[in-house]
């Protein structure tokens, strides 16, 4: 993965690695950071380097450390075991019905848990994985898709926005049989568009839900339910369990009642690492993950995400969902970008719309929609909404003012 020099330096200081796997053309500023002593071997277009640093003690089952999509710029890592990774790969292969005839193409970095899971689940079943370094906006990528008879495409919500602009639904791709989506909630209209197209053309469209802390998959929406349950994250993956709990930790059994989503399964990581000593720790989570997502379950057992637990604020005693506020604004002003942050009685809206008139229109619209005073909505212009490589908004970069 491409890592900023200051973060790389911090990671090296924190975790004291003995080996480094780096590209041949690593920037000079990065070379100065790496404590390189000798080259162990060259692999494709990369080098495996060894330093004299004595590495930290490792827990016997620790297999992999991955950054979470929400911790860009942070040394906090997820501690995954071999069992976590293998169990999740098996489960994904089961519900996607992956066989050795599948031909996926790499579209996401392997350092991203979604990208890793695609490789692992297909490799487990002996499928052929097409390696591509081309951006999906290039003609070279789509030529490769056609030439290699690629059978599945994957993407985060932003990818599907690009698919829509590129008119994927009008392309001649006879070998394409499966689409999968994860990495954030897909806007309802895109879910509907690709769901209808897949059903009408005999393809399968899987909307999925996961977090790096679960290696990463926890739920999927069966393709035959894609329209009936449009907007849903689906049901638990094979071998996993999902439930909702209230603020007191009691399980919620009534349908259409919002609570925190809790997952249990063998793919749940051992915990986080924030320093070298954490790498020697045993399993702290014991197969249970409190996702931090607020959701509801319908009477048929299908789950729907409504927002992040930390993305709710109180405004004059009313509970306001910041994620819902963003969705309302995106629907009302479809050509603009929005990000909402806030604290009690203050809701800040960052938008790519520039004029004061547009900002007044935003405040008035929210006041009418939420029945809250317009003065609680503070609207600010921003050139672009800050996003991480997974396409998720970096709220930590937005000031509450």
Please annotate each region the language model reported.
Residues 1-56, 353-355:
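Structural core segment of the AMP-binding/adenylate-forming
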Residues 63-90:
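Conserved AMP-binding A3 loop
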Residues 86-103, 113-152, 237-239:
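Conserved AMP-binding/adenylation subdomain of ANL enzymes
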Residues 265, 270-271, 292-374:
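AMP-binding/adenylate-forming catalytic core of the ANL superfamily
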Residues 370-393:
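AMP-binding/adenylate-forming catalytic domain of the ANL superfamily
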């Amino acid at each position: 993965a491409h890592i900023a020099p200051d973060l790389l330096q911090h990671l090296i200081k924190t975790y004291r690695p003995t080996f480094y796997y780096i590209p041949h053309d690593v920037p000079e500023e990065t070379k100065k950071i790496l404590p390189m002593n000798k080259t162990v071997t060259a692999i494709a277009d990369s080098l495996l380097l060894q330093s004299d640093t004595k590495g930290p003690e490792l827990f016997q089952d620790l297999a992999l450390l991955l950054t979470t999509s929400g911790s860009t710029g942070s040394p906090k890592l997820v501690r995954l075991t071999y069992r976590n990774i293998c169990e999740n790969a098996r489960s994904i292969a089961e519900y996607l019905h992956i066989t050795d005839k599948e031909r996926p193409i790499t579209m996401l970095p392997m350092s991203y848990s979604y990208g890793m899971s695609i490789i692992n689940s297909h490799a487990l079943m002996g499928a052929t994985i097409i390696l591509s370094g081309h951006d999906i906006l290039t003609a070279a990528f789509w030529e490769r898709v056609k030439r290699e008879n690629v059978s599945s495409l994957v993407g985060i919500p932003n990818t599907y926005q690009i698919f829509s602009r590129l008119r994927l639904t009008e392309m001649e791709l006879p070998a394409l049989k499966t689409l999968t989506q994860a990495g954030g909630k897909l806007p309802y209209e895109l879910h509907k568009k690709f769901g209808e197209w897949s059903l009408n053309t005999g393809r399968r469209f899987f909307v999925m839900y996961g977090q790096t802390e679960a290696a990463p998959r926890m739920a999927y929406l069966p393709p035959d339910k894609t329209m009936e349950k449009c907007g849903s994250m689906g049901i638990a993956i094979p071998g996993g369990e999902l439930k909702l709990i209230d603020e007191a930790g009691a399980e919620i059994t009534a349908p259409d009642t919002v609570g925190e989503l809790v997952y249990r399964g063998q793919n749940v990581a051992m915990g986080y690492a924030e320093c070298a000593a954490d790498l020697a720790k045993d399993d702290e989570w014991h197969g249970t993950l409190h996702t931090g997502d607020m959701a509801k379950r319908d009477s048929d057992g299908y789950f729907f995400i409504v927002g992040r637990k930390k993305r709710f604020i109180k405004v004059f005693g009313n509970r306001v969902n910041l994620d819902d506020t963003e969705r309302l604004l995106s629907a009302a002003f479809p050509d603009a970008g929005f990000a909402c942050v806030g604290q009690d009685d203050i809701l800040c809206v960052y938008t790519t719309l520039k004029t004061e008139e547009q900002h007044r229109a935003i405040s008035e619209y929210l006041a009418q929609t939420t029945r809250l005073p317009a003065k609680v909505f503070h609207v600010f212009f921003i050139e672009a909404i800050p996003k991480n490589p997974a396409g998720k908004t970096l709220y930590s970069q937005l000031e509450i003012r």
